[in-house]
From Swiss-Prot:
Top-level lineage group: Bacteria
Hydrolase keyword on record: yes
PANTHER family associated with the record: CHEMORECEPTOR GLUTAMINE DEAMIDASE CHED-RELATED
Name of this chain's protein: Probable chemoreceptor glutamine deamidase CheD 2
One Pfam family it belongs to: CheD
Organism: Burkholderia thailandensis (strain ATCC 700388 / DSM 13276 / CCUG 48851 / CIP 106301 / E264)
Enzyme Commission number(s): 3.5.1.44
Function, as annotated: Probably deamidates glutamine residues to glutamate on methyl-accepting chemotaxis receptors (MCPs), playing an important role in chemotaxis.
Family classification: Belongs to the CheD family.
Gene Ontology BP annotations: chemotaxis
Top-level class of the enzyme under EC nomenclature: hydrolase
Single annotated GO MF: protein-glutamine glutaminase activity
Catalytic activity of the protein: L-glutaminyl-[protein] + H2O = L-glutamyl-[protein] + NH4(+)
Keywords: Chemotaxis, Hydrolase
Length: 195
């Protein structure tokens, strides 16, 4: 499941945690939250419709070849389309959408040679540019993981960089597992799928 509900004691309100590979759309007084390392999260909103959403994703693969880069970008396209289409179904208009971008850090040693955080950040910026959706803020790249709290009805986002060693280790473990799962789903060059 891409998200789960909980009560956030720090903010004293209902919240939705968006997990890696997930997204959530909300218009009520609910907070969307996630924790990011190399993954990216796009917080998108339409202020007139008072609806917003958040996704959390990573491009799979090592970035070692045009074919694999092309295949892995399909995961990013899917994550972005799910978010945008979910907002449109809730009354948003594409020309009014604004985005805040987070994540894309270099926090996992085993993935640092692939520059996965940089690839994720570059992908999301290029995608939004191609779709004509303006980025109005965020916090990307660097070496620290982040906790992002997003209030979709207003478009307000808070970002806290995490420094505790245990937080970094937990995020790195979670993202390694997510990357491994995505890599297993990425088709192998020359493979044939029978249907």
């Amino acid at each position: 499941m891409g998200y789960h509900f909980y009560f956030d004691r720090e903010f004293g309100r209902q919240a939705v945690r968006v997990n890696p590979g997930g997204f959530a759309i909300a218009s009520a007084d609910v907070m969307l939250a996630t924790v990011l390392g190399s993954c990216v999260s796009v917080c998108m909103f339409d202020s007139a419709a008072r609806v917003g959403g958040m996704n959390h994703f990573m491009l799979p693969g090592s970035g070692n070849g045009a074919r694999n880069d092309s295949l892995s970008s399909l995961y990013g396209v899917n994550a972005m389309e799910l978010l945008i289409n979910g907002l449109l179904r809730r009354g948003a208009l594409k020309w009014r959408l604004r985005a805040k971008l987070f994540g894309g850090g270099c926090v996992m040693q085993s993935l640092s040679d692939t520059r996965i955080g940089e690839r994720n950040a570059a992908f999301v910026r290029a995608y939004l540019d191609a779709e004509g959706i303006r980025s109005v803020g965020g916090d990307m790249l660097g070496t620290r993981p982040r906790r992002v709290c997003y209030f979709p009805s207003t478009g307000r986002a808070l970002c806290k960089r995490l420094v505790r060693g245990s937080d970094v280790a937990d995020i790195a473990t979670s993202e390694r597992a997510y990357d491994g799962d995505l890599a297993r789903r990425l088709p192998v060059a020359g493979s044939v799928e029978l249907f």
